[in-house]
């Protein structure tokens, strides 16, 4: 087993008229906090988007827990326990906090012994417990359009934790926060 949880080796990504990443190699050990710093347009978000399966590298290889992977989509990345909080949140504004977090992994109960339905009572309870466990205070029944941006960021973080992401990617984590919230 590799000592690295993430390895991106010789990654190159080109877009028409621009090279976003040119022969980039990073290695991250389990439990390590890794920060990628650079000016606007330096390719940081592109590199992290490749790790989350939103883009494929033109050249290079990605290894997760020592195994070479081809991340074909964010769903594939999620199955490998990779989560990402994007600079521009991916939330459904007319859904509740709990609905946004559990979407795609909803707890189900049987009605009349055989009809599966989403168990929102359990979802709300699970999200309340998760938010308390990690000190990310949210009310699971609040609607996204009614909450502020810093709470939306907490929702995105809770979404990763609910999915049991082991590799957490934060793209521009302080961009939407006020100085008091940082």
Which residues fall in each region the model found?
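Glycine-rich phosphate-binding loops of nucleotide-dependent enzymes
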Residues: 2-182
């Amino acid at each position: 087993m590799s000592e690295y949880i993430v390895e991106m080796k010789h990654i190159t990504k080109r877009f028409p008229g621009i090279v976003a990443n040119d022969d980039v190699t990073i290695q991250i050990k389990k439990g390590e906090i890794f920060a990628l710093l650079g000016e606007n347009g330096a390719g940081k978000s592109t590199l992290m988007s490749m790790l989350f399966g939103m883009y494929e590298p033109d050249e290079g290889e990605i290894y997760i827990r020592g195994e070479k992977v081809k991340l074909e989509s964010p769903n594939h990345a999620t199955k490998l326990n990779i989560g990402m909080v994007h600079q521009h949140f991916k939330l459904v504004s007319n859904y509740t906090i709990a609905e946004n977090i559990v979407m795609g992994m909803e707890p189900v109960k049987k009605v009349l012994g055989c009809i599966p339905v989403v168990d929102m009572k359990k979802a709300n309870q699970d999200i309340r417990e998760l938010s308390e466990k990690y000190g990310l205070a949210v009310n699971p029944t609040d609607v996204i359009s009614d909450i502020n941006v810093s709470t939306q960021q907490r929702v995105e973080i809770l979404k990763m934790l609910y999915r049991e992401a082991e590799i957490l990617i934060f793209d521009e984590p302080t961009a939407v926060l006020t100085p008091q919230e940082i």
